[in-house]
């Protein structure tokens, strides 16, 4: 009888998702899901917050925007912090800061205090998921990276769907304060488990913070995202405030790239883009993030403004996307480990294209099965593309490069989502004005108009949404180019 060689046996063990790896992934998911939920859970409560604090929607929107800005700004610190202090220690500290921000947000006494505490939440939350991904990438190794990334990607795709559902239910049943307090028991459980189960990582005490690169990159990202959000809210590219912010942000990021190429240990190693796997994965994530995550922010507005759905009903209408993603992710992860990202991701992009095409034809009275089926297809496409392409980003990288690669790819994803939201909001605003030339209000006024003129306004608004989704379709199709250049197989 032939005996399996120790080498082959070891290789087989390296491909198996052991209980230790699965437990580690569960802890990371538990901590990460709250931070992603909080990017969307507050959206359904903005009107209530505006009434309670007697302030305008233009002011109260910063409760949502400041979290995103703080979240994106600290991601570049992840690589340095994990190397300087150890990933486990920084993960626990970040979770503790996020929980403190949640507690204080729930106790907020004014709109100013709530915005400040949401910023604290974002600073803590921004590092949790990329740190967890780096820990898992190092523990899993190249033979299991696709399946592990699919597991940890669950909160990224499911939380934005269930966030509005949970938020709407909590606001209706209790109070807006509970959308923040709900994080505390989950966070406490994640903290206790992580303190016991996350592996200790040797800190590199000699690592120094890139003090010159920090304000350039973090400040540039913050200014750029702020400018884009202002373009979306003001509906004008030429307005001085967003224009200066966007151009200033681009200038700071450009200066950072120049600095990083001349520094031994920059905050984000831009030399990673010289690796084909990382560069193509980053480009794929950027295009899909702009198109699909931006679109998924606008779809709830379509349901509420055009079809008159409540916040809770809207959250439930978005569930098919989450189901599609949940079904596709484990299958795509297993296939990626076997045949490589290049064979999986383009197929996922094509499935997403089918769903987006359906929404370009959307009407005010489109049947529910049509909308649900299209969302399910978009979810399948997202589940088969985002995390497999993230796994491909590690191809060709050394063990030591993985933490910095993780922070870079996560920053790209968050920026892409912000960029997509702002750009599609501008397209939507202009499309609405094209359909309704006498309309000069915002999206809230658009909803009131649909209620006042149910015979004509909903159809015109639905047409504006369809026009906007054509823009998303173009970006989704364009993502096929870098997707077809992804690595064929993970290295052995």
Residue ranges and their predicted role:
Residues 77-79, 83-96, 104, 109-113, ...:
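C-terminal module of multi-pass small-molecule transporters
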Residues 49-50, 81-82, 166-174, 228, ...:
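Interfacial helix-cap and linker-helix signal at transmembrane-aqueous boundaries
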Residues 172-184, 230-242, 310, 430-473:
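A membrane-interface helix-boundary motif in multi-pass transporters
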Residues 20-77, 113, 153, 175, ...:
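Transmembrane core module of solute transporters
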Residues 13-16, 22, 143, 191-218, ...:
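Flexible interhelical linker loops that connect adjacent transmembrane helices
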Residues 2-32, 258, 277, 391, ...:
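Transmembrane-helix exit segments and adjacent C-terminal regions of multi-pass membrane proteins
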Residues 185-202, 219-230, 248-262, 480-487:
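C-terminal membrane-cytosol helix-exit motif in multi-pass small-molecule transporters
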Residues 68, 75-213, 239, 408:
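Helix-loop-helix hairpins in multi-pass membrane proteins, especially solute transporters
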């Amino acid at each position: 009888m032939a005996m399996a060689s120790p080498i082959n046996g070891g290789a087989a063990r390296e491909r198996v998702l052991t209980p230790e790896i699965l437990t580690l992934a569960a802890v990371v998911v538990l901590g990460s899901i709250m931070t992603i939920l909080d990017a969307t859970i507050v959206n359904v409560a903005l009107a209530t917050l505006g009434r309670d604090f007697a302030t305008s929607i233009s002011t109260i929107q910063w409760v949502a925007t400041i979290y995103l800005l703080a979240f994106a700004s600290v991601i570049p610190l992840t690589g340095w912090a994990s190397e300087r202090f150890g990933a486990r220690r920084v993960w626990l500290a970040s979770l503790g800061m996020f929980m403190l921000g949640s507690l204080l947000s729930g106790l907020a006494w004014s709109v100013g205090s709530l915005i400040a505490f949401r910023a604290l939440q974002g600073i803590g939350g921004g590092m949790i998921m990329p740190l967890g991904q780096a820990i898992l990438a190092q523990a899993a190794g190249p033979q299991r990276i696709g399946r592990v990334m699919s597991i940890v990607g669950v909160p990224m795709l499911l939380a934005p769907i269930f966030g509005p559902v949970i938020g709407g239910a909590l606001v209706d049943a209790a109070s807006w304060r509970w959308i923040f307090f709900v994080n505390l028991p989950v966070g406490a459980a994640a903290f206790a488990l992580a303190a016991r189960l996350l592996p200790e990582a040797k800190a590199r005490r000699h690592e120094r913070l890139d003090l010159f690169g920090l304000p350039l990159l973090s400040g540039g990202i913050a200014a750029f995202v702020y400018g884009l959000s202002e373009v979306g809210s003001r509906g004008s590219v030429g307005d001085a405030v967003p224009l200066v912010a966007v151009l200033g942000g681009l200038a700071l990021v450009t200066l950072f790239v120049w600095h990083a190429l001349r520094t031994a240990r920059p905050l984000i190693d831009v030399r990673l883009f010289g690796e084909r796997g990382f560069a193509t994965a980053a480009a794929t994530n950027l295009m899909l993030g702009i198109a699909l995550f931006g679109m998924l922010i606008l779809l709830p507005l379509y349901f509420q403004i055009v079809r008159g759905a409540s916040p809770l009903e809207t959250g439930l209408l978005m569930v098919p996307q989450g189901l599609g993603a949940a079904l596709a992710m484990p299958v795509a992860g297993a296939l990626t480990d076997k045949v490589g990202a290049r064979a999986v991701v383009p197929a996922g992009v094509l499935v997403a294209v089918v769903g987006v095409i359906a929404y370009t034809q959307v009407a005010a009275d489109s049947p529910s099965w049509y909308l649900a089926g299209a969302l399910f297809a978009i979810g399948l496409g997202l589940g088969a593309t985002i995390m497999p392409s993230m796994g491909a980003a590690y191809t060709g990288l050394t063990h030591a490069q993985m933490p910095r690669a993780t922070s870079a790819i996560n920053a790209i994803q968050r920026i892409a989502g912000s960029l997509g939201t702002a750009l599609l909001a501008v397209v939507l605003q202009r499309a609405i004005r094209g359909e309704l030339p006498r309309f000069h209000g915002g999206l809230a006024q658009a909803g009131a108009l649909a209620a006042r003129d149910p015979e004509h306004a909903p159809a015109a608004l639905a047409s504006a949404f369809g026009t906007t989704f054509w823009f998303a379709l173009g970006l989704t199709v364009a993502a096929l180019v870098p997707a077809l250049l992804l690595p064929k197989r993970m290295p052995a």
